[in-house]
A protein has these predicted regions:
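C-terminal accessory/tail domains of diverse enzymes
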Residues: 1-184, 195-576
Length: 576
């Protein structure tokens, strides 16, 4: 496959340096991914909530055909047996392509085989063959990429997948009517393993997986910085300390025992010790931050005994470069832990896990600490790869005054599951109450600048000093509020708390704005945003400057409402 210009430059050099570092350490760590794409402008159910229907099969065929053309391989198109989930009347489609690794040429059969060819079983994994599939999931089509032996080949494969999706009219992201950007609606999982199950680094170095689990648990940025909108216990990838307390305590015991046994740990023992504990609150092994279903799972046959570990707390990246950077990050963490597995005990985060680590500022700090640690242990990420990890949208609001900068950014919110957990096991998605939003208020002050006050809907935001950046102080607060009234949902009678009125009192002045969730003038939007530029304009239009002198005076919230430091408007009188 001929490399396109987007893979040139500093990024490619850093990717090659990364591969050279792992080769020098004799670490063989293959990479897999399952990028998901959607029809961004469509409001049809198969591109929102349903797995199949409409044009999804047609678009899946277009995507696979375009990807095989991008790769330039002599693939054989295969109509394979797809998965069938509880409650579904028939298996989902599975569009496959099979070829010999390292070969080049044109497809050996017609793409029509994907419609009228014989129905074949999915082939068993083989190190000399590549197997690529396109399958449906709710709202998206998923591309299951063949494993790559190094980051450079993963870069080529990822960029080809994104180009093919664009050719097929599919997108890795969506925009809501109000301009909010989100991912495709599917996941962006990364899988690591070896060329064969026996050569998996998780079996060759049995201490690696326990060390990875400790490392991730001690660095919440790895759980949240790249996650989707739904995080926490009801998400697709909850942390071990977000589930049942007893399981987390037992995980500490299992990790101690595995590490004490060192190289004597067998694949059976490794999987058997961890699989019952790496699950969500209902015991679902698929919904876990670190998924070991295909590590050494005899219940799934050969496909479950593959030596693979999947990292699931990852949203679909907007660009192939970001996907490659995330893969490089987790690959580097594994490489660091192969030779230096001691990272310390599991941490008791308590309420800080869903308070402090909900805020972008702390996640950025922790992620930088991870990168510093990797560099200290000889597996650094270059500046271009690192920059991809910190890519983010502009703040919702930014205001400047002499010696001061005020920014408001979206923060994470941990949406609760509705009803009995077990009763939702047959659904394609969990039913949560997503009506609560959290914002980070960040005030950066030059030396000697008075703090002033920030008010939200008449209540003072509990700004706390959290860091010094050179001569500057950084103060943070969080605000939680109900954005809309869901049905079904929690807290009947609690109305939507918007628009949010923001007032900044600084050096005797009051600057105000109203932050709307929808068009300030009301009424429907004509259609979805055409592109990222129009989406950004709609977001800007929802923040309306107002005369600060007309807004109510700021008063402190009652004791018990401001915690860690969060102002929860849902717990305050609605009249401000």
């Amino acid at each position: 496959m001929q490399r396109r210009p987007e893979a040139a430059g500093d990024l490619l050099e850093e990717v090659r340096a990364h591969d050279a570092t792992l080769r020098a350490r004799n670490i063989e760590l293959w990479i897999g991914a399952e990028p998901t794409f959607t029809l961004r402008q469509s409001q049809d159910p198969e591109w929102l909530v349903q797995a199949e229907g409409g044009r999804k099969l047609e678009k899946g065929i277009e995507l696979l055909q375009a990807l095989v053309a991008e790769l330039g391989v002599p693939a054989r198109f295969v109509r394979a047996r797809g998965r069938q989930f509880p409650g579904e009347l028939q298996p989902r489609f599975c569009l496959g392509a099979d070829w010999v690794r390292g070969s080049s040429g044109k497809p050996v059969n017609s793409v029509s085989a994907l419609l009228d060819g014989p129905l074949e079983a999915v082939p068993e994994p083989h190190p000399e063959r590549a197997w690529l599939t396109v399958t449906p999931d709710p709202g998206v089509v998923e591309v299951n990429l063949p494993p790559s032996p190094d980051l450079e080949s993963f870069l080529d494969l990822s960029e080809a997948a994104y180009r093919a999706a664009d050719t097929a009219g599919l997108s890795p992201e969506r925009f809501r009517f109000n301009g909010e950007g989100t991912d495709s609606g599917g996941g962006g999982q990364i899988t690591l393993g070896g060329p064969t199950p026996q050569a998996s680094p998780f079996f060759v170095q049995p201490w690696l997986l326990p060390a990875v689990l400790r490392y991730l648990q001690r660095h919440p940025s790895l759980s949240y910085a790249f996650a989707g909108e739904c995080v926490g216990s009801a998400s697709q990838g909850p942390r071990p300390d977000e589930g049942v307390r007893e399981r987390f305590e037992e995980l500490a015991v299992s990790l101690d025992r595995l590490e004490a046994r060192g190289r004597a740990v067998t694949p059976e023992e490794l999987w058997g010790s961890l699989a019952p504990l790496l699950v969500d609150a209902s015991g679902n092994a698929h919904r876990a931050e670190v998924n070991v279903e295909k590590l050494w799972n005899p219940g799934l046959g050969p496909r479950g005994m593959a030596g693979l570990v999947e990292f699931r707390s990852l949203r679909m990246p907007r660009t192939s470069r970001r996907l490659v950077a995330i893969a490089a990050l987790f690959r580097s963490i594994c490489a660091r832990l192969v030779t230096s597995p001691t990272v310390g005990p599991l941490r008791e985060w308590g309420t800080a896990l869903h308070e402090q680590w909900a805020l972008p500022f702390f996640l950025e700090q922790d992620l930088r600490a991870v990168l510093d640690d990797l560099a200290l242990h000889g597996v650094p990420l270059g500046p271009e790869l690192s920059a991809q990890l910190f890519e983010r949208d502009p703040p919702l609001y930014a205001g400047q005054a002499p010696g001061a900068l005020l920014e408001v950014r979206p923060a994470l919110e941990f949406w609760p599951l509705l009803g009995d957990v077990a009763s939702q096991e047959t659904l394609t998605a969990r039913l949560v109450d997503p009506s609560t939003r959290r914002l980070e208020i960040r005030l950066t002050l030059e030396a000697g600048t008075p703090r002033g006050r920030v008010g939200v809907c008449g209540w003072e935001a509990p700004l706390e000093l959290v860091a010094h950046e050179g001569e500057r102080e950084v103060l943070l607060a969080a605000v939680r509020y109900r954005a809309y009234v869901p049905s079904p949902g929690l807290h009947p009678g609690l109305l939507a708390q918007e628009p949010l009125e923001l007032v900044w009192e600084h050096r005797g002045t009051r600057t105000g704005s109203r932050m709307h969730a929808w068009k300030p003038e009301g009424g429907p939007y004509p259609d979805l945003p055409r592109d990222a530029q129009e989406a950004a304009r709609r977001r800007r239009d929802r923040v309306v400057p107002v005369d600060g002198s007309t807004l109510p005076p700021v008063k402190p919230a009652p004791i018990g409402v401001n915690e860690h430091p969060t102002l929860d408007l849902r717990r305050l009188p609605s009249d401000g």
